[in-house]
């Protein structure tokens, strides 16, 4: 069942005037990652307090979605019978946290309490990071080493093997079935990022099952296509309302003679480097949202932010598209129009100018909390000073919820409190999951204005 409210108690408060041009609907997300060791070995009570502090800070500057990393290297930051507890949580792979704690369940509850979405984020194909040397007995490297390809200090699931794709989709099905998540998210790691002249040795797999392909690059892209299609349908068959999204590397393809519709860039590409054909997935309807990681600054010689923002706006039609923003790089850049400032305002303005973009996602969340060069302050006071609803996903099934029933206001010593009953709905997809309260001094004012949102 989707999380929904039958009776909601709200104490009305005064709305502070702010920028009326802020959109009513906008994705405002942030990635909370485990791979940076920020959780490792911290006692449960202390980690709960730290995560709550971060969520308070992020909600306080207007964010409405959290992408929480729950799988780093074929492990789990949640209770799982399929993969071991993550060393990035407890310090030792396979060791459970104290107090019988489930970080994913905790984050779902805390995000929903703050009216934020929670998207469970997994790294699909990485089986081992560079620093891991010990593995739990039930880790896939121990159980099925024949399905793993070593690449330098990394180890990855061979994307060509149906057994591996099935296993990752089984992980997705388990999470979607057992947890009240709002979204399921995978990042940019498909085939590995190149390391010098190091070769990803899948020659044996290609020889064994080329699937009719003569070109290995096309074969690899097909392997990833099959995975994306399978995991999308895995999520949707269980809970069609759970949004499935991907955050690919920021360049799809560079513009060339052979591909004139690419971006005016000269950097590393998804299509030829990671074998990730993002536009094909969008065309096939296998993504609900896309967050290209456009982590560079405007003025970058091979990957200009402004060029890429416009390119994604123009080319990702049919899919909600949000820009991945690198906080720390942004504050080191110089605004091309205001050299006394960093590039934060410049980038956020571009996102709202281009019609094919519907929001931003910030990397990493901790950087927003730490507020370098007043980054969080600018969000809270200028760009996200009024709440925003999630963008409408017109392509999802379901009908608009009906009107609330039995609405009444009760005076209390703390002020007026509203009560109502949820609208009736025959199907799960037709149920209301959140409510918005507006206060209008004059009925002529529009509920489309975020100024009037409580």
Annotate each language-model stretch with its function.
Residues 25, 33, 37-46, 120, ...:
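Active-site-adjacent "subsite" loops/lids of carbohydrate-active enzymes
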Residues 63-99:
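Aromatic-lined carbohydrate-binding/catalytic grooves of carbohydrate-active enzymes
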Residues 374-430:
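Pro/Thr/Ser/Gly-rich low-complexity, intrinsically disordered linker/stalk tracts
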Residues 49-76, 178-182, 280, 284-289, ...:
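Catalytic domains of carbohydrate-active enzymes, especially glycoside hydrolases
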Residues 76-91, 126-151, 188-211, 257-267:
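Aromatic- and acidic-residue-enriched segments that line the glycan-binding/catalytic groove
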Residues 430-454:
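Recognizes extended acidic, P/S/T-rich segments that occur
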Residues 163-294, 299-323:
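Active-site neighborhood of glycoside hydrolase catalytic domains
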Residues 275-301, 316-396:
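Substrate-binding cleft of secreted/luminal carbohydrate-active enzymes
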């Amino acid at each position: 069942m989707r999380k929904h409210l039958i009776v909601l108690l709200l104490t009305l408060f005064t709305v502070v005037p702010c920028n009326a041009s802020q959109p009513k609907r906008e994705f405002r997300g942030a990635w909370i990652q485990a791979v940076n060791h920020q959780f490792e070995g911290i006692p449960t009570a202390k980690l709960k307090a730290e995560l709550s502090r971060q969520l308070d800070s992020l909600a306080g500057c207007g964010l409405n979605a959290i992408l929480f990393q729950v799988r780093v290297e074929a492990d789990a930051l949640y209770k799982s019978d399929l993969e071991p507890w993550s060393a990035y949580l407890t310090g030792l792979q396979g060791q459970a946290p104290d107090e019988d704690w489930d970080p994913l369940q905790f984050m779902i509850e805390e995000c929903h309490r703050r009216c934020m979405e929670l998207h469970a984020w997994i790294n699909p194909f990485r089986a081992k990071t560079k620093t891991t040397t010990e593995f739990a007995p039930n880790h896939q490297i121990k159980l099925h080493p024949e399905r793993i390809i070593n690449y330098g200090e990394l180890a990855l699931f061979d994307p060509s093997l149906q057994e591996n794709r099935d296993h990752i989709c089984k992980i997705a099905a388990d999470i979607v079935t057992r947890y009240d998540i709002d979204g399921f998210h995978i990042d940019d790691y498909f085939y590995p990022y190149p390391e010098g002249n190091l070769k990803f040795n899948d020659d044996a797999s290609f020889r064994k099952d080329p699937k009719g392909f003569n070109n290995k690059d096309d074969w690899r892209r097909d392997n990833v296509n099959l995975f994306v299609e399978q995991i999308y349908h895995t999520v949707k068959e269980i809970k069609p309302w759970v949004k499935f999204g991907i955050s690919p590397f920021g360049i799809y393809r560079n513009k060339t003679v052979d591909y004139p519709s690419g971006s005016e860039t000269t950097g590393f590409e998804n299509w030829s480097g990671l074998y990730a054909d993002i536009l094909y997935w969008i065309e096939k309807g296998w993504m609900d949202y896309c967050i290209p990681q456009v982590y560079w600054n405007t003025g970058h010689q091979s990957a200009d932010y402004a060029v890429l923002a416009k390119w994604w706006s123009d080319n990702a039609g049919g899919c909600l598209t949000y820009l991945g923003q690198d906080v720390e790089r942004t504050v080191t850049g110089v605004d091309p129009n205001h050299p006394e400032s960093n590039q934060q305002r410049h980038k956020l303005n571009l996102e709202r100018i281009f019609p094919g973009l519907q929001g931003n996602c910030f990397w990493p969340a901790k950087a927003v909390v730490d507020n370098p060069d007043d980054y969080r302050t600018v969000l809270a006071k200028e760009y996200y000073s009024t709440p925003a609803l999630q963008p409408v996903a017109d392509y999802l099934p379901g009908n608009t919820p009906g009107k609330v029933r039995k609405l009444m206001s009760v005076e209390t010593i703390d002020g007026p409190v509203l009560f109502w009953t949820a609208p009736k709905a025959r199907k799960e997809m037709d149920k209301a999951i959140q409510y918005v309260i507006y206060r209008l001094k004059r009925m002529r004012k529009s509920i489309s204005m975020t100024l009037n949102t409580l």
